[in-house]
């Protein structure tokens, strides 16, 4: 290209310049294609791979056809002996390989002593003894303290003998209470104390009797009145029947 330009400069005639220009236009320019560069790259990588394989030691494949470079000379098995499950897990785990390859790793472990042992004098109390030896503290008001075999009672088997029993009213007491109820359904504190003294009852018993009597009357009124205590509602059908 430079020679063509020099000829153009040296030529004085326009015809020579035209011929040189046409010759320059007709000469094609070619760049190296990617297809031509690929074989050279493949050849270089192949030569590098061959040089690496030639410098590295060759490992004999195992019976299964697998070659493990990290396990050569580290475990006691070879083509004639298959690794166990624990050994295979140690091979595949990089933590174990780093530990065994490092000679100072085993010196960093602390050796612990035997686990704690129970003392020889310690004994568990047995429950095979007689239950009569077990004593349960009781209060002064409980009935278990008065019984001869109070020590045999257990917390879940304490009797309820100390509970006050219900005392029924006598006929003369009921008749007098009914008379007082017919006169007045609610007693004052003074009248309640007088009535309890006359009937030889506690004021609480008189109060409870009047409460139960009022509840009984309420239930009787509800039973007689039905679901409509203020009377049945008047419907158009009932109005026609009345008229």
From Swiss-Prot:
InterPro entries: HD (IPR001356), HD_metazoa (IPR020479), Homeobox_CS (IPR017970), Homeodomain-like_sf (IPR009057), HXA10/ABDB-like (IPR046333). Gene3D superfamilies: Homeodomain-like. PROSITE patterns: HOMEOBOX_1 (PS00027), HOMEOBOX_2 (PS50071). Signal peptide: none annotated. It is found in: Nucleus. Its main location: nucleus. It holds the Pfam family Homeodomain. Residues 1-12 have a biased composition (Polar residues). Keywords: DNA-binding, Homeobox, Nucleus, Transcription, Transcription regulation. The keyword Phosphoprotein does not apply. One of its GO terms (molecular function) is DNA-binding transcription factor activity, RNA polymerase II-specific. Interacts with nuclear receptor nhr-25. Interacts with geminin homolog gmn-1. Interacts with homeodomain protein ceh-20. Transcription factor, involved in posterior embryonic patterning, morphogenetic movements of the posterior hypodermis, and cell fate specification. Binds to the 5'-TAGT-3' motif in regulatory elements of genes, including Meis protein psa-3 and microRNA mir-57. Involved in a negative regulatory loop with mir-57 to specify posterior cell identities. Required for asymmetric division of the T hypodermal cell, acting via the regulation of asymmetric expression of psa-3 in cooperation with ceh-20 and the Wnt-MAPK pathway. This is Homeobox protein nob-1.
